[in-house]
Amino acid sequence: MKKVLVFVLLFSLVSFSPLHAESQNDDAPVKMGEIVVTATRDIQEIRKAPSNVTVITAEEINDTGATTVVEVLDKLESLQFRTYSGNSSQSQLDMRGFGGDNPFGKTLILLDGRRLNRTDMASINWLQTPVNTIERIEIVRGSGSVLYGDAAIGGVINIITRKGTDKPKFNASVLAGSYGLNDERVGVTGATGHWTYAVTGENNFNSGYRDRSKYSAQGGGFDVGYAANDLLNVSLGVSFNKTDYQMPGALTKEQMEQDRRQYQPALPAYFMNAHPDDDGSDKYTNVNLGFKSFWGAWGQMEINFLYGKKDLQMNMPSWSSYNYSDTNADTYGITPKYILAKEIFGFHNKVIVGVDFYNEPYKKDIFSDRERTKQLSAAEFTRESMGCYLRDEFNLLKNLIFSAGYRFERASIKGSNLDFLTPSNNFTDQKNTYNAEAYEAGLTWLVDKQSKVFAKYSTVYRIPFIDEVASFSGFGGNFLTGLEKEKGISVEAGAEFYPLENLKLGLTLFRVDMEDEIEYVYNPVTFTGKNQNTGKTRHDGAEVSLSYLWPKYLKVFGNYTYHTATFEDGANNKKEMPLVPKHMANAGMEVYLPFNLTLRPEIHYVSDSFLSGDNDNSTEKLESHTLLNIYLNYKPTFGNLNLTAFLGVDNIADVKYSSFGIDYAQYGMPNFYYPMPGITYKAGLSFTF
């Protein structure tokens, strides 16, 4: 840690020293197309990135009537969400077929560049970032291990919050809908002199489609920026959120036929309890202090000091008396980087070099009662990592870009467990260290003014979660010193073409081969199990997208995704991985009607997939489903007042479906499913001035 602080201090002194600085204004402004930050960790035109990239703006989010980030992302190619409760509070993301039984560490989620992924084996809470705080969301499909390291396998999603610009703007909205949905938002952004500011707040509540599936989320944030001069910018962003949620449990098919909206009843024949009291409460705080120093022809330096805090309370008496837990997880990060764009022999070249340091203390206490009067165990761990990366882009020709990069990362997990009931589960000061490398090389051919063709080869890796390495949650205690990281190779190629000015066609093909994937292996003889590096898997896929704009009349859009994910060795060789649908498709149109009205019908299709745990593909599948949605927007303008009125109906046909199911047939029990909401109505009103 001391070495890191010394490095950062020296880096900062050099970064913000004016001795070699030249005014940023010395460079003539360059006109760019649609830009993205996540693909290269710097401002970059989307079409120059060797990746399939999507950017969603705040205006697009507002037009959809979405109340959560999950609702925004779920209609994009290669993205699918599953949930245990029918709402967004416990959603799990499948990106590029990396769903399976452990999707948590296969897609990297960022908030303004800071990692949101948890260090334990659990999904992030997607409600921790209110949609009112979001300026844009950038989705970069495919490997990002060189630039971001651990977990950037299926892709990287960066949620970028609002920043102040220009004159002050005030916005507010209210939305209500079925199952007790109500959502209220307010915000103000602006700039004055050298200062910029943005303040937002949101309240989101839903009683839930099922009994015991209620959630409420309150959050907000602010961002303050100061441009000291042409050489230095300073920014401070802070966000917070509190989410309370219930967990209704799963149902058998017979129970769903009786009442698909009930919480899970008891099944004494299978020693399964009812779920009338399962719930949780999460609190999140995120802080990002950033400095940018512009050196003109000598490039620019950036450094961010990051802090995140998670206080998570979980109550699951339906499982056992061991399932009252408090988890406290902090994140301390320092991420300096240097960027230099310079011509070499008349050809454009840009190099980025940086360091990502994270220190993440983790503490979990388990109790025997909701009041936390009797503690059963206490576990404390620290995950620390430092990754150094280098990436370069060089124009071989004016319209042909070669990119290459390398990353080395060292991560350690160390900690102790104290079990007050079973001392044999105790361990002290155990430690694992992981060394990881990633490489990438890509080519991007710029065709005409808008189109591109690209190809990319890269390696990927994932460091084990704390609770994959250590067992400390009331089911034994051990520390697996031999558990290795997951690693793999990713290859992709694609194109985006504009055969007409307003017609965009996209196609991306990819393959990811993984090895040493971590799986819990159960021994039926000893009735025990542990996590092991079990073998190889393959993920093949294709992503197709289309959009066409007929100005003043309509916009047509659609996408299709093909996935196949298979085990490539062992007893289940060539069997399909669970919870990966082969086909997903979305289509819709915006019809621009008179009187500032816009009608948007949509269709959403997901094919069947094998149930969780069905590695040998021996039981029934999770059924396919097709959903129809329709929305109507009214957007008049009264001087400086911009108004949007919104009406929407999701799942018009009231389709009965589930997004998640578990194979219990292998244990002689019925399979279990998590029902999703039926037909849902919602309406809202927003204004900006």
Where are these regions (language model features)?
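Membrane-embedded beta-barrel scaffold of Gram-negative outer-membrane proteins
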Residues: 194-195, 300-316, 366, 444-464, ...
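Face-selective signature of the C-terminal outer-membrane beta-barrel domain
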Residues: 230-241, 280-422, 428-429, 446, ...
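Short acidic/polar hinge/loop motifs at secondary-structure boundaries
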Residues: 114-141, 482
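Surface-exposed extracellular loop regions of Gram-negative outer-membrane beta-barrel proteins
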Residues: 250, 255, 359-368, 410-423, ...
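Transmembrane beta-barrel wall of Gram-negative outer-membrane proteins
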Residues: 176-205, 210-249, 278-296, 340, ...
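N-terminal periplasmic accessory domains that precede
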Residues: 69-72, 92-96, 107-110, 125-130, ...
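Conserved C-terminal beta-signal and adjacent last beta-strands/turns
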Residues: 7, 226-228, 239, 390-392, ...
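Gram-negative outer-membrane beta-barrel transporters
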Residues: 345, 397, 402, 410, ...
